[in-house]
Amino acid sequence: MGQNQSAQGGAGEKKDDKDKKKKYEPPIPTRVGKKKRRAKGPDAAMKLPQVTPHTRCRLKLLKLERIKDYLMMEDEFIRNQERLKPQDEKNEEERSKVDDLRGTPMSVGNLEEIIDDNHAIVSTSVGSEHYVSILSFVDKDQLEPGCSVLLNHKVHAVVGVLSDDTDPMVTVMKLEKAPQETYADIGGLDTQIQEIKESVELPLTHPEYYEEMGIKPPKGVILYGPPGTGKTLLAKAVANQTSATFLRVVGSELIQKYLGDGPKLVRELFRVAEEHAPSIVFIDEIDAVGTKRYDSNSGGEREIQRTMLELLNQLDGFDSRGDVKVIMATNRIETLDPALIRPGRIDRKIEFPLPDEKTKRRIFTIHTSRMTLAEDVNLSELIMAKDDLSGADIKAICTEAGLMALRERRMKVTNEDFKKSKESVLYRKKEGTPEGLYL
């Protein structure tokens, strides 16, 4: 009985061993058909490439020589980088020392005179002059009398040179975009347009005409007449028609706060005009600086007279202006200094009178061409009236008539609107003061 039980237990153990042997085991993975993973990181960069074939042959020798060349190039590059590191650090250190010597902030001055290689006389914006030293790191080739230099704020030593020393005020005076006005926008003034073309446009576009005639073209013109007769408008049309550089300035801009800044601005204005020649310089309201000279104890009046003297020198000085034409405008020509408007400086004086009936009609036609007029509008009544209307007054009448129609929510301008606007414009012109905004 016991033997049977032991036999049965042995058979069960053998059966369990067979089950264990039959347990599934996955096959060993193979590398056939799979890409070998590339090692990454610094270890891969330092590892030399494998060279095949493994046997000794000439092909293996050539590959090893090529690897050697690459390693030598890498070694040379690393040594050069290591050698340049101290130089870069040295340059950075020297640059910081130069910045410390210059100091911050740096003031801007004008170089008046170079005494020797290490000393110069400079002037500041307040007008005072100083005998100062020139530091060794300043480029001496760029130093010349009249240039703008950087000064140390404590000892006023020259620590640098401004490469672009163009006055920002002169840069603003240069027109980047031509005005929209053309000769077609000017009513009448046919004679004035012809004269300014002969004096300004033709010498720049066709100088050979004057050479064949054996004459020198005019250097400049002055436009004078009552206010609102089209002087500035004609200058805008000239700027639109010509491709020359156009510089415009108002006479009051030449009057500066500090001593000597006004003449300096005039010199800078004409210097920029020469650099960008052919060019046209338009000076509006010239009576602000060009009035008759008289004895005065006021420092401001003497500064204005010095500015005018510099303007006289630029117009007809020792140096020729070249292809630089000057247009001046004023409504008080009787107050100008005779030396300013004499022949040789201003060769042509173009008068702008008040418009006659024919000119008034053309001006009204220009300003009403885009307006929607009612059938009862009769512009002849406004034109035939004996009122002293300038071109600006006619434009104001048309604008006021359009505003009256807009106020009453009408799309057409009537004859009554023109009558009321004319009365309003003439009343304001007579009184000289604008009407009250609130009634």
From Swiss-Prot:
Example of a GO MF term: ATP binding
GO-annotated cellular components: cytosol; nucleoplasm; proteasome regulatory particle; proteasome regulatory particle, base subcomplex
Where found, per UniProt? Answer: Cytoplasm; Nucleus
User: Per the record's keyword annotation, is Nucleotide-binding included, yes or no?
Assistant: yes
Q: Which Pfam families match?
A: AAA, AAA_lid_3, Prot_ATP_ID_OB_C
One GO biological process term is: proteasome-mediated ubiquitin-dependent protein catabolic process
This protein's UniProt keywords: ATP-binding, Cytoplasm, Nucleotide-binding, Nucleus, Proteasome
Disordered: annotated span? 1-48, 82-104
Q: List ligand-binding residues for ATP.
A: G225, P226, P227, G228, T229, G230, K231, T232
* Compositionally biased spans, kind Basic and acidic residues: 12-25, 82-102
Primary role:
The 26S proteasome is involved in the ATP-dependent degradation of ubiquitinated proteins. The regulatory (or ATPase) complex confers ATP dependency and substrate specificity to the 26S complex.
Q: Which family does it belong to?
A: Belongs to the AAA ATPase family.
Query: Oligomeric state and partners?
Result: Interacts with PSMD5.
This chain's protein is named 26S proteasome regulatory subunit 4
Q: Origin organism of this chain? A: Drosophila melanogaster
